[in-house]
Amino acid sequence: MSSSYDEASLAPEETTDSFWEVGNYKRTVKRIDDGHRLCNDLMNCVQERAKIEKAYGQQLTDWAKRWRQLIEKGPQYGSLERAWGAIMTEADKVSELHQEVKNNLLNEDLEKVKNWQKDAYHKQIMGGFKETKEAEDGFRKAQKPWAKKMKELEAAKKAYHLACKEEKLAMTREMNSKTEQSVTPEQQKKLQDKVDKCKQDVQKTQEKYEKVLEDVGKTTPQYMENMEQVFEQCQQFEEKRLVFLKEVLLDIKRHLNLAENSSYIHVYRELEQAIRGADAQEDLRWFRSTSGPGMPMNWPQFEEWNPDLPHTTTKKEKQPKKAEGVALTNATGAVESTSQAGDRGSVSSYDRGQPYATEWSDDESGNPFGGSETNGGANPFEDDSKGVRVRALYDYDGQEQDELSFKAGDELTKLGEEDEQGWCRGRLDSGQLGLYPANYVEAI
């Protein structure tokens, strides 16, 4: 028996990572604490997504508000203006849906996890969770008898291995003494007695080692059964968590997936209908009747001189006022066409930004920058030393001598309020004074 002994067996036995090793149940216990932390992680995850949904919804709202104003003030008109505006309506409605997503995530999903976590994990006064302590105590109790046997086994194995080592050393010394002349017979006998004693120690320690190993083998089935029972209890607890969180994730998916939301689908169905409702021919007819050859015209006629009427008219007096329904000679059809276009709802921002026709008059009284006698003896802009700074939204080329010209982004000074015809007085940074369409600028 001793002759087969190998010194390599004296090296400490490598411990395995098996669940059955003493103390390796702690990973299963730790999983309970991890489950509580994972609930917190999921709630934080949902809360961050809710913030994103809220921010995105607000961005859509701000974007829609800004562009709706720009479209209303811009030159686009007619049914295409309404179709373009439908994009802004879509943004407002989608913003509301994303706010609903945010509310569902916080009020339903997050609260659901929070309540389940509170019911599943019970904190102790001394710290930790009741469920963790129960699992720890269960495993420790199940492993205690087997761990005690394993300790005895380790001691018996160590004693046996040490005896084998002593035996081998004694045999080596005894063999070497036979070749040495200096060793006396008495010394030779002592070395032989040492070998015999070591062999007896090896026999005793081996028998004890085998007996303890046999006892461990007898207790192993009961040990495995007890450990398995506690482990299954932990598995059942973990199964509840896994199933619950899967349900929550499906709820989150349902709330996030707007593609399956009937309201979301309806938004884009309405948007498509609004865009397809744009009619180029209708818009062209409307423009023809309001700003083209279809407009009414007070064609020149012979007029008798009337001493009771002023000889000149101002710029505003020369403009036809559609809203007042003025009947003009030879323009009945055009007026009716204009009225019909209005009935169809083709009210456009273009009306508000349309430059007015050039007067057919050489009289200087029609020019606000003309002689002092015609304009009450003073330039109407000279008293406006102060004003409001504005920025041009679009390019505008003055059509008349008294109109300003500027490019989009240019800044100028507004010197008066908008008149009933949609014009404002202003001053360029160069010092030039004149009129400009009020809806072509925005306050800075």
From Swiss-Prot:
GO biological process terms held by the UniProt record: actin filament organization; cytoskeleton organization; negative regulation of endocytosis; neuron projection morphogenesis; plasma membrane tubulation; positive regulation of dendrite development; protein localization to membrane; protein localization to plasma membrane
Membrane topology: Peripheral membrane protein
Biased composition (Basic and acidic residues): 314-324
Mod. after translation: Phosphorylated by casein kinase 2 (CK2) and protein kinase C (PKC).
Residue ranges of every copy of the F-BAR domain listed in the record: 13-283
Keywords per UniProt: Cell membrane, Cell projection, Coiled coil, Cytoplasm, Cytoplasmic vesicle, Endocytosis, Lipid-binding, Membrane, Phosphoprotein, SH3 domain, Synapse, Synaptosome
Coiled-coil positions: 26-275
Polar residues compositional bias, start-end: 329-351
GO cellular component terms, semicolon-separated: axon terminus; COPI-coated vesicle; cytoplasm; cytoplasmic vesicle membrane; cytosol; endosome; perinuclear region of cytoplasm; photoreceptor ribbon synapse
Subcellular localization, as worded in the UniProt entry: Cytoplasm; Cell projection; Synapse, Synaptosome; Cell projection, Ruffle membrane
Annotated stretches, region: Disordered: 175-194, 309-386
Modified residues (Phosphothreonine): 184
Superkingdom, natural source: Eukaryota
Single annotated GO MF: identical protein binding
Domain notes: The F-BAR domain forms a coiled coil and mediates membrane-binding and membrane tubulation. In the autoinhibited conformation, interaction with the SH3 domain inhibits membrane tubulation mediated by the F-BAR domain. DNM1 binding abolishes autoinhibition.
Subunit structure: May form heterooligomers with other PACSINs. Interacts with MAPT. Interacts with TRPV4. Interacts (via SH3 domain) with SYNJ1 and WASL. Interacts with DNM2 and DNM3. Interacts with both COBL and DBNL. Identified in a complex composed of COBL, PACSIN1 and WASL. Interacts with EHD1 and EHD3. Homodimer. Interacts (via SH3 domain) with DNM1; the interaction is reduced by DNM1 phosphorylation.
Function: Plays a role in the reorganization of the microtubule cytoskeleton via its interaction with MAPT; this decreases microtubule stability and inhibits MAPT-induced microtubule polymerization. Plays a role in cellular transport processes by recruiting DNM1, DNM2 and DNM3 to membranes. Plays a role in the reorganization of the actin cytoskeleton and in neuron morphogenesis via its interaction with COBL and WASL, and by recruiting COBL to the cell cortex. Plays a role in the regulation of neurite formation, neurite branching and the regulation of neurite length.
Stated family: Belongs to the PACSIN family.
Protein name: Protein kinase C and casein kinase substrate in neurons protein 1
Organism: Homo sapiens
